[in-house]
């Protein structure tokens, strides 16, 4: 792995951005907790509890968890880890076969909402360096009720539009490509169904212009920060039924199945000695398999 000053500067810049984005997202989510109508969401507004962790083999991170009244469970985490891939992992990572040392920094979040009419969401962006370096990440929306799981539902239209704007600023071919990649990635083969309505997913993003690739990854984060609170405000005032809560709990089971069977981030974290509590914090707080 290159240890030149230029790469160190890039690592520091990426880490600083992910930590800044974490702070902005946590503030926005706490604001939503404050705004949630008390008749639907009794109790005190939630606040994030942050907990630092260290990775014995190098690096660490900060978990941010909130169990609120509107956000039933949300985790917003940052981590910066480094070390040496196992031979098994090195074979699967670009540039690691020649030199197994790696560096990875990023942000990840998953929000599970109290109200079944407010969709769950997942977002992550990351920067990874071996003898090569690249960005990856994306965001995807998971409505829990059937009528919301249609591409012509307003929330789906607006969610896709937000990421299209972020992509089109750089290349009009990126959004169709990364949207299709998201649909392919967040799919449960054993159920033959998508996890949600999609979004974008990208990986190994290295155009040769690091500053431009970094700017794109920042805009992906900003797009999330703009659109998801908008969708939450749109739906959080709607009352829900016991039947809708039941549908929500059953649909959450698909989330668990995907994360444990297919999710790259989960597997990467567990295979590189990541923080297990942080990795599995994506699990919903309550779920049913009928």
UniProtKB/Swiss-Prot annotation:
Q: Where is the protein found, in the record's own terms?
A: Cytoplasm
Indicate whether Metal-binding appears among the record's keywords: yes
Q: Which InterPro entries match?
A: Coprogen_oxidase_aer (IPR001260), Coprogen_oxidase_aer_sf (IPR036406), Coprogen_oxidase_CS (IPR018375)
What residue spans carry the region label Important for dimerization? 255-290
Instruction: Give the enzyme's main class according to its UniProt record, as a single word.
Output: oxidoreductase
Q: In which pathway does it act?
A: Porphyrin-containing compound metabolism; protoporphyrin-IX biosynthesis; protoporphyrinogen-IX from coproporphyrinogen-III (O2 route): step 1/1
Tell me if Coiled coil is a UniProt keyword of this record: no
So which domain of life are we looking at? Bacteria
> In its UniProt entry, what is this protein called?
Oxygen-dependent coproporphyrinogen-III oxidase
Q: Which organism is it from?
A: Caulobacter vibrioides (strain NA1000 / CB15N) (Caulobacter crescentus)
